């Protein structure tokens, strides 16, 4: 089951000019629509509170309906809920929808998957100026590669507060390269770089563990990264059910998905080697 919401960016222009009663601007205003798809996922996890309790205290605690209300059950449920969210976050970039799959990575299309799809459709490209070809990023060239990439962004994007989403290894290489390059320059007071050098503190570096092995880096605004969940009403539940005297079922159904609000050059610049090769040097041969 799929939930869909149309999002997008309004395009058009309007300008004041010298007073002229006869001048009328008839250029239209349009919306470039994009569809945020959320997919219904489900999981049933059977567990035994008594088994968990016995590993610590060596005795049983309860049975029947009372199992649902003991502290150890609440602790296990809190743990499972947190793991559910953590596993979705772990594949937020790399997930690829596979209806016959059983894992979080099969539930929805992540941002890297969407990026590759749009590249293959020529909607993200150098010609459209929302893509820039980069070299593999190593500790010897990271500063130059990221600065060149940032300077290739549209002027509108560059004057906006942006985030540069990169693998953790790319950030490590950037810090090492920065230290080796300007380590003794007086104005350098810290090697922990939060913003990209020469971006006037407009480009925040965002290293992500869930982008490991990625073929892309993304320069965009936080508001352009849409994550959809909820609003499934009666189809969405997180609950505990008891169908066995000593065991409980953790049952969860929810919608989840991701999308860019727009892929226009004013809001997004993608850096890649060839759309497939990991951007971090030394990965993938």
Regions inferred by a protein language model and the residue ranges of each:
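Sequence/fold signature of self-assembling virion shell proteins
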Residues: 1-4, 10, 108-140, 171-285
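Short helix/loop capping segments that flank catalytic or ligand/cofactor-binding pockets
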Residues: 55, 89, 173-175
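Alpha-helical scaffold segments that mediate packing/assembly in large oligomeric complexes
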Residues: 58-145
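Helix N-cap / beta->alpha transition motif
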Residues: 46-53, 57, 166-170, 220-221, ...
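Assembly/oligomerization interface modules of large self-assembling protein complexes
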Residues: 1-58
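Long, repeat-rich segments with strong aromatic
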Residues: 160-169, 173-175
């Amino acid at each position: 089951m799929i939930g869909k919401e149309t999002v997008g960016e309004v395009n058009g222009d309007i300008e004041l000019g010298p007073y002229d009663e006869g001048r009328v601007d008839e250029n239209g205003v349009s919306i470039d629509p994009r569809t945020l798809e959320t997919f219904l996922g489900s999981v049933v996890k059977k567990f035994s509170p008594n088994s968990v309790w016995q590993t610590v205290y060596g005795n049983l605690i309860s049975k029947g309906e009372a199992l649902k209300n003991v502290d150890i059950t609440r602790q296990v449920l809190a743990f499972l809920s947190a793991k559910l969210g953590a596993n979705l976050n772990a594949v937020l970039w790399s997930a690829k929808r596979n209806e016959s799959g059983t894992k979080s990575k099969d539930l929805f299309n992540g941002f890297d998957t969407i990026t590759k799809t749009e590249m293959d459709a020529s909607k993200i490209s150098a010609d459209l100026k929302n893509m820039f070809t980069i070299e593999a990023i190593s500790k010897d060239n990271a500063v130059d590669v990221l600065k060149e990439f940032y300077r290739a962004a549209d002027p509108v994007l560059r004057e906006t507060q942006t985030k540069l989403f990169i693998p953790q290894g790319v950030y490590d290489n950037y810090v090492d390269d920065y230290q080796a390059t300007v380590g003794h320059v007086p104005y350098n007071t810290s090697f922990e770089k939060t913003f990209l050098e020469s971006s006037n503190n407009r480009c925040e570096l965002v290293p992500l563990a869930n982008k490991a092995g990625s073929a892309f880096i993304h320069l965009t605004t936080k508001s352009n990264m849409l994550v959809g969940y909820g609003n499934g009403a009666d189809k969405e539940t997180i609950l505990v059910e008891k169908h066995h005297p000593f065991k409980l079922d953790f049952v969860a159904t929810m919608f989840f998905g991701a999308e860019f609000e727009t892929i226009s050059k004013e809001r997004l610049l993608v850096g890649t080697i060839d759309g497939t090769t990991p951007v971090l040097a030394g990965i993938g041969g």
